[in-house]
Regions:
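Short, structured segments at the rim of ligand-binding sites
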Residues: 1-410
Length: 410
């Protein structure tokens, strides 16, 4: 299935964004660890969260988390401390996403996790038991989800956890998010320099409501940046958000988008400012990178983006995917060191009728959709259903905002 998205005559939207996937997935684990009687409010209905809900509410011993990378990491750690024998698997892509660093760390802390097929990759067999805990070291450059997975079960280890992070720590806001949510559930950690300590202690159940997703908001910021005339209100966003991706508001200010906070959320307006070149390190906000890459080239703003190392191991190799798909639209990007992507304004002949491949990656589909605002023929996107991973109502919300969306198979 392909969608062709065409620009509205005028873009007007008041959007109820999906709940933050990052907060949902952490809150679900913490709710389970605290044996909470409370139902989490405003829980996302995206694929990743539904996979986690199903697993945590299941009496099964075998779990298929499909393409949900966060669920794979968080549940692997969670199940390692739940007495019993468990298996966890996923899609073929998931079976090629490395998990050795987390498995080694868990086993060093007293867990017993084994590989069922290829060394270092899912599927896994987990023999859950009480964990001794102790002291381990991890490279700071590993996925923050490995670190978060360990931290959330740390207070329930016999000796707690002392975690030394070596080198540059990437995605710090996601680690901070985990620690802030743990504190809301009654567990305090100490983060001094490169070391995080969590002593043995109990979680306490609390009523919890999830805030809206700043990552999802970024696509609407892109639409505002690319539009000549638009009125956009995004509901459920807070200025003092727990989410690191809230930094996108300040960054989009350099692309001409102003943010006004209200008691309902935020209102977007053109601010009259637009940088001539954008340099930024996305090490703390990797999920915003695709949105800014696509927005910048369509605004004809050269850029140099660093800190993109985690993009190589996401749903797809996002660096290669961006280069390939933007070449179809006539833009030549270069990358280096597996972590830098830049565009100096170089163009090439665009394809006559480009179709954007999404690589089973929800963020590819959502980042490219705003291109409809500047491309005369609109933009055609393959496998648009991939958005269900994090923002199931994305296309419905675009239609409500005035976009014309044509299902090319009907």
């Amino acid at each position: 299935m392909n969608y062709t998205i065409k620009s509205p005559d005028s873009l007007k939207a008041s959007v109820k964004l999906p709940a933050s996937k990052s907060i949902c997935n952490r809150a679900l684990i913490l709710n389970a660890l605290s044996y909470s009687p409370y139902e989490i409010l405003n829980l996302s209905d995206c694929d990743d969260t539904e996979v986690m809900v199903k697993a945590l509410n299941s009496n099964d011993r075998d779990f298929d988390i499909k393409a949900a990378g966060t669920a794979m990491r968080f549940l692997t750690a969670f199940l390692s401390k739940v007495v019993g024998e468990w298996t966890i698997t996923g899609t073929e892509r998931m079976k090629n996403r490395p998990i050795k660093i987390l498995v080694d760390a868990l086993n060093a802390l007293g867990a017993r996790v084994e590989y069922m097929e290829k060394e270092g990759y899912p599927p896994l067999r987990i023999f859950g038991s009480a964990l001794q805990g102790g002291e381990i070291s991890l490279a700071g450059g590993v996925s923050s989800q490995y670190i978060s997975a360990l931290l959330m079960i740390a207070p329930l280890m016999e000796n707690g956890l002392t975690l030394h992070l070596e080198g540059v720590v990437i995605s710090k806001p996601y680690i901070n998010l985990t620690l802030q949510l743990m504190e809301q559930y009654g567990v305090k950690a100490e983060w001094n320099g490169q070391t995080i300590k969590v002593r043995p202690q109990d979680y306490h159940p609390i009523p919890f409501t999830v805030e809206s997703d700043w990552s999802a908001a970024s696509y609407w910021y892109s639409m505002m940046a690319l539009s000549k005339n638009a009125e956009i209100e995004l509901l459920g966003l807070f200025k003092n958000s727990l989410q690191g991706d809230a930094a996108g508001a300040k960054l989009f200010a350099q692309l001409g988008v102003g943010t006004t906070y209200t008691d309902r959320g935020v209102v977007l307006k053109h601010n009259g400012n637009r940088t001539k070149k954008l340099n930024y390190n996305f090490v703390n906000e990797p999920d915003l990178a695709q949105t800014f890459v696509v927005t910048c080239v369509l605004l004809n703003i050269p850029f140099r983006f660093t800190g993109l190392q985690s993009l190589k191991i996401k749903e797809t190799d996002r660096i290669e995917a961006l280069k390939t798909e933007l070449r179809k639209l006539g833009y030549l990007l270069t990358d280096s060191n597996n972590s830098i992507l830049e565009w100096n304004g170089e163009r090439c002949e665009p394809q006559a009728h480009p179709v954007i491949t999404t690589y089973e990656d929800h963020r590819m589909a959502m980042a490219f959709a705003p291109a409809a605002l500047v491309l005369p023929e609109g933009i055609e996107i393959a496998d648009p259903q991939v958005v269900s991973k994090s923002y199931p109502h994305y296309w419905r919300d675009l239609r409500t905002a005035g976009f014309i969306i044509i299902d090319n198979e009907q």
